[in-house]
From Swiss-Prot:
HAMAP family: IF_2_B. Residues 570-737 form the tr-type G domain. Residues 55-369, 426-452 are annotated as: Disordered. It comes from the Bacteria. CDD domains: IF2_eIF5B, IF2_mtIF2_II, mtIF2_IVc. One of the essential components for the initiation of protein synthesis. Protects formylmethionyl-tRNA from spontaneous hydrolysis and promotes its binding to the 30S ribosomal subunits. Also involved in the hydrolysis of GTP during the formation of the 70S ribosomal complex. Residues 579-586 are annotated as: G1. It comes from Myxococcus xanthus (strain DK1622). This is Translation initiation factor IF-2. The gene is infB. GO terms for cellular component: cytosol. Residues 625-628 are annotated as: G3.
């Protein structure tokens, strides 16, 4: 179901003439009970429509609903004019009335007789019409001044039109206009034979021009006039209502136009047909007791036998009804109608209603009715659908509605609301009914309507009869049908592994159930723990699922390169300088570069990998300076992996050291040729032969000894044989025939990476293949980005880097790991996909390492005293390589007593977040070549977190070892101080019992821990409360002196007791 917002409701109100802004509309809706907060709040379509209608009803005056009349047609006729009426008054009355239908043509008007109001009018002379008395089964004749044939409708009562409405009465189709006052008409006299010989002939009517005359029947009781009522077709009455009255003085009929509806034959007790107009229907024969048919006009209806002849005289009109309404009943003119019997008694009660020839009811007028009053007669027939005639707004006053519950159906108001299932609509009765109140329609009355019909219903407040959709009956309480997934669709695609919760979500199985399955397989797992593809396939098979292993191939996203020899170009060699710490590696490089990098290193040792490109007489050479400390093992290994030649620097006075051996192993593992530079040849303690001998033990045999290892004795201080070293490097590069394709997408290696405060992540990249250019999309490890800027080793901004050269690259999403490969891809989108895949694999690997302890392991740890202590550290370093080296060095310090756990290691300054991370894990923060931020120091003091920064690697290691020893419980030992014998006891108020003792040996110190011995048994151990000599408080009393000793919480002292004094000494445990 669609929704409408408040501002849309305001626009809709504006289209209806209600000017309200959004705030006012929100206020109005809130007052109506709708939950709206602002102009962007929304309501359902039905609620919005109902709310608009309520606001319109409140803001706009409600228009009167046009009255709905009963279905059928109304027959109206004019009675004689009132006494004293003049032609002018008749004309004014005729002009004042609004005709419901204008006849096509009107013959000359007939004249009306008018008398003075003070004089009694003479009797009206009615045409004589003898009525024969037929036999019992034959129809009888009923004398009436006027005969009219109408189509039967629902039976209705007859009422006289009030005088106030006479001027607004509608003219009959053939109403005559008043031309001149004619002479007084004679009273009609017509003998009437009672139908079925049961009704006596009425007497002559009294000369009352305003009172109607009709046949009288003694059977029906008189009743007061009631307004005409419309009865439904299902009424049990099946006869028509006949109204008869005497003719007005001087009233004449005139022939109507042709085309009128023909009259039907009169039934038993029915009304005879009237005179037919040109082209009208011929009159049918009168039934028993009915009125005779009138003479037919040209093409009109002939009079039937046995009935009362209808009159056709001058000025009489044949029935020509309004379109779609049937013929208008004819009226009689003076001298041409049926005369009333002179012996007929006057009937002051009013007209008699005949139903099927039998008197149905008698109307007793309460006042004098005007002869020109219009009377409505509603005739009905059972089981015939009638048409409802609804007058316009202007005609509502002229045609009053028939009252009564059966005449006008009850109006109900309904509200359209969603049904209880939310799939359809239903109508709720909101009519004001005190008896029933609001009632909800049953499901059988539920109807589906269109949006336009709903809108019309709400705006017009009317019920639209619509047909609802047929729905199949459903059984209550039927269970929901669950559709089973096809077997070919029950496939889960995996790359490496999947978490338990994700696997359960894909199969539609609860995670707790899968955990039970894993426990049955002997694996303890949590909902977020990853399981490998094999385990997932085993579990999924139990539920009818299959595992499809789909590997993520990075090669699919990397550009394909065709290697062609003609595209290869020579490139400069990459040389890594390796060796033991303090053997002069950086000094030798400074001598070659003619710079002084070693002076800038903290502690005079190299703790980073430095990449430098140097131009020599033999060409360009790229040097990588690696650290020699044992903590930087990974750096040396990384340097050996990306280099072409390794220069092993060995001090001539120290010879081969542990890191020298390690460097030899890294170079051999990388299958890189080694050139040995024996440094410090300027020292008097230099021993070249010893160094060569030591190297030969590690399979590095010099060329002069028949080997293939180039050894050059050099001196970084005196720059001895530096040119010879460079020449040998060039020769070795020519032997290797180093070449690469500069046209292919670039491939390189991350030598070092750091987080610069101004530039962000900065990576030192060694380009191995292709040309790295500005704007290239790159991916390295789990990070990606676009090359924003590049700086060479001399600090110059460059736009491209050729193979064999180094540069600092800015633009990565994070600090990459040292040693990671860097690749140029087609676009940044592909780089992001590769990085996200690698990040997911790293996360899966980390989660798979986390395992829950079994109950046996937990009991064993508790029994062993909780297991080894743990030192949790947070490491921050200036570059990624240093952070990795520090992490490895710290983890190597773990022993069986204390285990070091690295909570986090990163690059950059120490932040407040690092301090909070350490506080949460109850650890320490270690910084290497970085300083803490201002907020970090304050947070460390507030959280009581140890924060230490170091610039030299071995100082950091010593500090960590000290922290580890501090976690161990100290060793507590007793150190004996002295002994004293109790000679006497004294009771001192507020101090208790004081022992007068003599010091036997050692020293008695105040505050020491004492042990009371009695007969070589310990009675009490506590703290010495006081120590006095005479009246003075003293700190200690030596051997051979007497003193007073008080013991806390102990007064049971006796002479001869021995008091031993001692103290607890704590010593720190060692990590071993």
């Amino acid at each position: 179901m669609s929704k409408k917002r408040v501002h849309e409701i305001a626009k809709e109100l504006k289209s209806h003439g209600i000017e309200l802004d959004n705030k006012e509309v929100v206020t109005e809706l809130s007052s109506l009970g709708y939950d709206v907060k602002s102009h962007s709040s929304s309501l359902d379509d039905d609620q919005a429509t109902a709310a608009v209608q309520k606001i319109l009803d409140k803001r706009k005056p409600k228009q009167a609903t046009p009255p709905v009349t009963a279905k059928g047609f109304v027959v109206r006729r004019k009675v004689g004019p009132p006494a004293g009426a003049t032609a002018d008054s008749g004309a004014e009355a005729s002009q004042a009335a609004e005709p419901a239908y204008e006849p096509p043509s009107a013959p000359e008007p007939a004249t009306f007789a008018a008398e003075e109001p003070v004089q009694a009018p003479p009797p009206v002379e009615a045409p004589r019409a003898p009525v024969e008395a037929p036999s019992a089964p034959e129809p009888q004749r009923v004398e009436a001044p006027v005969a009219a044939a109408t189509e039967p409708t629902a039976p209705a009562a007859v009422t006289s039109t009030p005088p106030a409405q006479v001027a607004e009465a509608t003219k009959a189709p053939a109403a005559a206009e008043v031309a001149s006052p004619p002479p007084a008409a004679e009273a009609p006299q017509a003998p009437v034979e009672a139908p079925r010989a049961a009704v006596p002939a009425p007497a002559a009517a009294q000369p009352r021009p305003s009172v109607q005359e009709s046949t009288t029947l003694p059977q029906p009781p008189p009743r007061s006039p009631v307004p005409p009522a419309v009865r439904t077709p299902s009424s049990t009455s099946s006869s028509a209502t006949v109204v008869s009255r005497g003719p007005a003085p001087g009233y004449q009929q005139r022939g109507g136009p042709g085309g009128g509806r023909p009259g039907g034959p009169g039934g038993p007790g029915g009304r005879p047909g009237g005179p037919g107009g040109p082209g009208g229907r011929p009159g049918g024969p009168g039934g028993p007791g009915g009125r005779p048919g009138g003479p037919g006009g040209p093409g009109g209806r002939p009079g039937g036998p046995g009935g009362r002849p209808s009159y056709q005289g001058p000025g009489s009109y044949q029935g020509a009804g309004r379109p779609g309404q049937g013929p208008v009943r004819p009226t009689s003119a003076p001298g041409t109608g049926v005369q009333a019997s002179a012996s007929a008694s006057p009937i002051p009660q009013g007209p008699t209603i005949m139903v099927g020839g039998v008197p149905h009811a008698q109307v007793s007028p309460t006042g004098t009715a005007r002869p020109t009053a219009t009377q409505a007669v509603v005739i009905s027939r059972p089981l015939i659908q009638v048409r409802r005639v609804t007058p316009t707004a202007g005609q509502a006053k002229q045609y009053p509605m028939a009252p009564g519950r059966t005449g006008i159906p009850e109006r109900r108001e309904y509200k359209v609301v969603p049904d209880h299932l939310g799939r359809g609509r239903e109508l709720v009765d909101v009519s004001k009914n005190k008896e029933r109140g609001q009632r909800k329609r049953t499901s059988g009355d539920t109807q589906s309507v269109s949006k336009q019909e709903l809108t019309d219903m709400v705006w017009g407040r009317v019920t639209i009869p619509i047909r609802g959709k047929k729905r199949k009956p459903t059984k209550k309480g039927a269970k929901t049908q669950i559709t089973q997934m096809a077997e070919e669709k029950k496939v889960i695609k995996l790359q490496e592994g999947i978490s338990v919760s994700d696997l359960g979500q894909r199969m539609g199985v609860r995670s707790a159930e899968l955990i039970k399955k894993l426990m049955g397989l002997g694996k303890m797992a949590t909902a977020n723990q990853l399981v490998d593809a094999d385990t997932a396939e085993m579990i999924a098979g139990d539920y009818g699922w299959k595992i499809d292993r789909v590997g993520f191939e990075v090669e699919d996203y990397l550009p394909e390169v065709e290697t062609r020899p003609e595209d290869e170009r020579p490139r400069p060699p990459v040389v890594a300088i390796m060796g033991h710490v303090d053997h002069g590696k950086t000094s030798l490089l400074d001598a070659i570069r003619k710079a002084s990098v070693a002076q800038g290193e903290a502690g005079g040792i190299t703790q980073h990998i430095g990449a430098y490109s140097i131009t020599t007489a033999r060409g360009d050479v790229t040097f990588l300076d690696t650290p020699g400390h044992e903590a930087f093992t990974s750096m040396r290994a990384r340097g050996a992996d990306v280099t072409d030649i390794v220069v092993l620097v060995v001090a001539s006075d120290d010879g081969v050291m542990p890191q020298t051996v390690e460097a030899i192993k890294h170079a051999k593992a990388a299958e890189v040729p080694i050139v040995v530079a024996i440094n410090k040849m300027d020292l008097p303690t230099a021993n070249l032969d010893r160094v060569k001998k030591d190297l030969a033990t590690h399979e590095l045999v010099p060329e002069e000894w028949g080997g293939d290892t180039i050894m050059v004795p050099v001196s970084a201080k005196t720059k001895e044989n530096l040119e010879l070293l460079l020449e040998n490097l060039a020769l070795q590069a020519e032997v290797l025939e180093l070449a690469s394709n500069p046209l292919r997408p670039s491939v390189g290696a991350i030598i070092e990476a750091k987080l610069d405060r101004g530039r962000g992540p900065v990576a030192t990249v060694l380009v191995q293949e292709g040309t790295l250019k500005l704007g290239d999309a790159v991916v390295t490890g789990s990070h990606y980005g676009r090359v924003r800027a590049m700086t060479n080793s001399r600090g110059e901004q460059v736009k491209e880097v050729k193979p064999g050269y180094c540069a600092e690259v800015v633009g990565l999403s994070g600090v990459p790991g040292a040693g990671d490969a860097i690749n140029v891809v087609a676009d940044e989108k592909a780089a992001k996909q590769i990085a996200e895949h690698r990040n997911m694999k790293e996360r899966q690997t980390e989660l798979s390492k986390v395992s829950r302890e079994s109950l046996e392991q937990l009991f064993a740890k508790t029994k062993a005293g909780g297991g080894p202590k743990e030192l949790r550290v947070v490491i921050k370093a200036d570059v990624q390589g240093s952070a990795e080296a520090v992490k490895q060095a710290v983890q190597k310090l773990s022993t069986h007593k204390v285990k070091v756990e690295v909570v986090h290691s990163g690059v950059g300054a120490i932040t407040e977040g690092d301090v909070m991370r350490a506080a949460a894990s109850k650890g320490v923060v270690l910084g290497f070549n970085v300083n803490p931020e201002s907020g970090a120091e304050a947070a460390a003091k507030a959280q009581e977190v140890v924060l230490k920064s170091y610039s030299i690697i071995y100082e950091l290691i010593d500090g960590v070892r000290t922290e580890m020893e501090g976690l161990l419980e100290p060793i507590r030992t007793e150190r004996k101080l002295g002994r004293a014998e109790v000679r006497n006891t004294f009771n001192v108020p507020r101090l208790g019992t004081i022992a007068g003792a003599a010091v036997l040996d050692g020293v008695m110190k105040r505050g020491a821990i004492v042990r009371l011995m009695r007969e070589n048994k310990q009675l009490f151990s506590g703290k010495m409360a006081s120590l006095r000599r005479f009246k003075d408080d003293v700190k200690e009393v030596a051997q051979g002196f007497e003193c007073g000793i008080g013991i806390e919480s102990f007064n049971d002292l006796k002479p001869g007791d021995i008091i031993e004094a001692y103290e607890i000494v704590e010593t720190r445990q060692s990590l071993t």
